[in-house]
Amino acid sequence: MTVSARPIVFAAAAGSLAAVGTALAGNSTGFADARADTEDAPDITNVSVSNDDGGTITLRETVSNRDVPESGDQLGFVFDVDQNPDTGSALYGTEVAVVFDGGRLDVYRAGSDGYLSEETPRPPSLQATFSGGVATFSFKASDLGITPGLGFNVTGTSFGGLGDADTAPDIRTFNYQMAAGAPPPALGPDTRAPLDDAVTAVGIPGLVAHLDYFASDGRGATADTIRIFHGRRVIKTIRYRLEDTNPFVAYVVRWKVPSKPKGKYRFCVSSVDAAGNKSNVDCARIVIL
């Protein structure tokens, strides 16, 4: 199984990475992200977060392979404003996203489809720049639904024009507290099911087809089952054990198309999270050329 990228708009130890990065100043911290872990997208290598006494939050993403954005690039952040991965969107429980492409700055909120799919007006306080390989975002906490003085979970995101992606941290979210030293809230039992999405695939007789799917879980871990159908009959079942899953990338299953295919083919994906919550079953066509 391999992965490919998912655009931003498609759409506490168990749920987030605690803010234990190197302290930069009062009410400020940051963390490093792996270098060269993306091919086409802006390669995020560091994220810093800070706030002032007036409630303005500033986030910076440092990328190693861009001085200025390239065509099709997106840089941004997704926020879990209530610090609860079991509410909000299926993307780690985030409720809001800010997306910057070098010329346009957009805001998205959780939609009825479970993703960050509803574009909303940009608050006046939200600003973004990209210069010297650093994307900087600033805004009033309350303008994005963050309670002043409290904290939030955040993930940095980047997407390239060819479909690659990077997230920081690589899995789950980073917890930041506006009051230095404050702990994140404790999480309750995980009762929320994952959300799966199969993507229409294309196959050529006798060759290997790539079957893409997304497995989105608030706490970022699923065991996945993929079933391939010829008509109504299951002809192959593929199972992956419970492991970390990133909702911003597509997981790719390889399947060799019969040399002389007849009839209709499709595949279906379903998942179970660490607490035993079962996802929806989502299916997509395999179009044989």
Listing of model-derived features with the role each one plays in the protein:
Residues 27-104, 158-167:
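Surface-exposed, glycine/proline- and aromatic-rich loop segments on solvent-exposed faces
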Residues 27-48, 182-210, 289:
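Short, compositionally biased P/S/T/A/G/V-rich stretches that sit at domain boundaries
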Residues 65-67, 143, 211-220, 230, ...:
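Extracellular acidic, Ser/Thr/Pro-rich low-complexity tracts
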Residues 83-97, 144-188:
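Acidic/polar low-complexity flexible segments
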Residues 90-113, 119-127, 234-246:
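Solvent-exposed serine/threonine-rich low-complexity stretches and specific carbohydrate-binding patches
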Residues 131-136, 245-254:
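Aromatic sugar-binding surface patches on proteins
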Residues 258-263:
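Surface-exposed, short loops/turns at beta-strand junctions within beta-sandwich domains
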